Amino acid sequence: LYSYISKRRFPRLRDMDLLEKVSRRRRKKSEEPRIAHKDYPSIEIRPEHIGQRSEGGHWEMDLIVGCRGSKAVLLTLTERRSRQEIIMKLPDRRAETIRRAIDRLERRTPQFRQKFRSITTDNGSEFLQYEQLVRSVRGGTRFHIYYCHSYAAWEKGSNENHNRMIRRFFPKGTNFD
């Protein structure tokens, strides 16, 4: 199919319309490697049944950032078993803003603790307020958080795949403000 489109057998389709066809530029390696916070729960201690997707209530979380100069971001949560997606537009990527968005989600969701048992996320600075993120607005702990290894996006693959699909509608450089 891809070769037919490249050979222009389908006049209305272009390479840009294909999900996997468009080439990507390689990122420059940063000089300083990013190290995960050693005091926070790693994905290595995450229970095996979460990785197997045998029960619902386990989510993956990430941010989609807009163009340079744009502060607004999209917070995406993907349920690992059902692939349900929650997308929230936030005014900025500060950790406090993320925490408030999770608080708002908890207040609006009936039976929150049954629907949100754990969240797997990356080591972005916006997700490193561990104590504040796990503290429920109703008291106690709202869910468990597990942090992926640095530069290991495949450890939360469902969310990364959904973010890639979202990027088809909001390509890099989109202003979310």
Positions of predicted regions on the chain:
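RNase H-like two-metal-ion nuclease catalytic core shared by retroviral integrases
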Residues: 121-123, 128-131, 145-170, 176-177
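Active-site beta-loop-alpha junctions of metal-dependent nucleic acid enzymes
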Residues: 66-70, 87-111
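Basic, flexible linker segments flanking DNA-binding modules
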Residues: 2-51
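A general structural motif
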Residues: 114-116
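Mobile genetic element proteins and their domesticated derivatives, centered on retroelements
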Residues: 1, 62, 77, 83, ...
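Short, surface-exposed basic-aromatic patches at helix termini and helix-loop junctions that form
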Residues: 107, 132-143
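An active-site-proximal beta-strand-loop segment
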Residues: 48-85
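Short small-residue beta-strand/loop micro-motif enriched in glycine and branched aliphatics
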Residues: 83-88, 171-172
